[in-house]
Amino acid sequence: TPPERPREGSNVFEFMNSSSSSERPTQHIAKKVAEDIISTKKKGGKIVLVGGPAIVHTGAADSVSELIRLGFIDGVLAGNALAVHDIEYATLGTSLGMNVHDASLAYHGHRNHMDTINAVFRAGSISNMVKMKKLNKGIMYECVKNNVPFVLAGSIRDDGPLPDVITDVALAQKEYKKVLKDASMVIMVSTMLHSIATGNMLPANVKVIVVDISQPTVTKLMDRGTWQALGIVSDVGAFLPMVASQIRKKK
C-alpha cells in the first residue's frame, strides 16, 4: 500500500507548504538524506542513482564516486552524457572542455569531448578501458571495479554514442527495470528525462529523492505520478558533497 500523505496541519493558509522549494535549509536536508541512505543500507536495502551530466559539470563526480566505492550505491541509471563527461573528467580533468577544478576553459578543450568518445571506442567498452588501465577513477570506473550495474540509455541527441549505450529504447527500459527491481530508495540527480522515465517504472512504496537546480523539473516529476518523491531544489555541486561529507562522519 502506498504511504499516506499526512492530514494534520493541512491548511489552505499554511506557510512554506509547497512540496518542493529552493527556500529550505540545505545543510539540514543533506544531513537527513545522508541519514536515510545509511539507514536504508543498514536494513539491507538497495539504493539506485539516476544521474545526469551536471553531476560532473558542477564538480560532484568525486562525491558520487566515493558513495559507490563505500557501497552506498547499488545501481546507476543514466544516459550517454554522464558517462562521456565522467570519463572526460577522469582522464583529462575537463567536462566539455572546462577544467572542473577551477571552471577555466582548457586550451583546445573543445576537442576533449570527442577525444574521450574515441578513446572508449578504441578500448571497445568502458570495462575494457578500466582493464587496460586507461580509466583509473570516476563514477564509471567505480561501477566497474565494484561490480555495480549501470545502464546507459540512448537518446536522439547523443554524441557517439558510447559502445555501452543501449540505443533501443524498449531494451533500455527493460534493463532499467532489472536494476530497479527490489529498490528501496532511488536518488534522482539533475536529469529530467531519465528521472521521469524511472519514476514511471517505480511502485509508490519506493522512497524517491529528486535533486535539481530547476524547480520546474522537480515539479514535473511529481506531476507525472511520482508524488511520493522528496523534491530538493539545489545545486548538486554543493548538495552531493554535503551528503557525502555527512555519510563520512556517520558511517
In which residue ranges do the predicted regions lie?
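Structured alpha-helical segments in the cores of large, soluble enzyme domains
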Residues: 25-40, 217-222, 239-240
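Gly-rich Lys/Arg/Thr-decorated short loops/hinges at beta-loop-alpha junctions or inter-strand turns
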Residues: 6-22, 43, 117-123, 157-159
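C-terminal functional extensions of proteins
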Residues: 99-251
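Glycine-rich phosphate/diphosphate-binding loops that line cofactor/substrate pockets in enzymes
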Residues: 31-47, 67, 142-145, 179-183
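Active-site histidine-anchored catalytic micro-motif
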Residues: 47, 65-68, 72-118, 188
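Gly/Ser/Thr-rich loops at beta-strand to alpha-helix junctions
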Residues: 52-58, 81-84, 158, 191-195
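Short, compositionally biased "basic patch" segments
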Residues: 1-18, 25-32, 140-145
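Short acidic, glycine/serine/threonine-rich loops at helix termini
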Residues: 2-4, 59-63, 86-92, 162-165, ...
